[in-house]
Amino acid sequence: MPKISHSALRRTFRELLATPTCVETASVFDPMSARIAADLGFEVGILGGSVASLQVLAAPDFALITLSEFVEQATRIGRVAQLPFIADADHGYGNALNVMRTVEELERAGVAALTIEDTLLPAQFGRKSTDLISIEEGIGKVRAALEARVDPELSIIARTNAGVLPTEAVIERTLAYQKAGADGICMVGVADFEHLEQIAENLTVPLMLVTYGNPKLNDAKRLASLGVRVVVAGHGAYFAAIKATYDSLRAQRQLTHSTDNLSATELTHTYTLPENYVAWAEEFMDVKE
């Protein structure tokens, strides 16, 4: 299998963003899954922050994974990847200066693009887990990310949560990040096409949506017409791998267990112990849901 340079994969991703089509990402979480995704013809993969936390820490998505741990996993994928892949870089692991370090490390790891979100992470004492940083801080992070990259083909995508703010505020944020120079805008929490149309109306950069399979947004042609080029429907491949591992090991031990009929998502919940983290956050941090 011929090797493809990281810069070439980044150009491929930019070419994808320039087309009038919308594609769905493959969830890639290790070198094998990246090779499988490329062999099956996926145009782009994504290393999700939540999936990396599960893979590295067996922990839920509470911003517990460190930059070095995330970069190590991205590097393993980048070493063999035959398709461009996006790194979900969460909040950039700190302030704007931390964002610069994040970009430097992930660029060396071989990612084609990375998302930097404006969620207030990690969760702060006495704050809601969905709180966002100010627009000004978000702009600073976008500008810092652009300054830090060496390869101009690396795409910097600004991410925000469209589900926790009034539509007018979402429009203000996305336009601000576009003006700051982001190569694309990623959104989670878009409710339906009417919501998307309102936000996308004045945006000219390519859009990326995290839909988690929302049936109200299940129309690739319509998404493409509104500027959406990449959709993350979820990380089904990873959860299927967890379920397959459980089923195989259970069969090997010839056991019947109370968790036998649980779905992949339920199994993940069982073994990551999220109730512990929720309780600790409430006890030690007074985090509001």
Curated annotation (Swiss-Prot):
One example GO MF annotation: methylisocitrate lyase activity
The protein's Enzyme Commission number: 4.1.1.112
Keywords: Decarboxylase, Lyase, Magnesium, Metal-binding
Binding of Mg(2+), residues: 88
Free-text comment on the cofactor: Binds 1 Mg(2+) ion per subunit.
Function: Catalyzes the decarboxylation of oxaloacetate into pyruvate. Seems to play a role in maintaining cellular concentrations of bicarbonate and pyruvate.
Subunit structure: Homotetramer; dimer of dimers.
Name listed for the protein in its UniProt record: Oxaloacetate decarboxylase
Organism, as annotated: Pseudomonas fluorescens (strain SBW25)
Upper taxonomic lineage: Bacteria, Pseudomonadati, Pseudomonadota, Gammaproteobacteria, Pseudomonadales
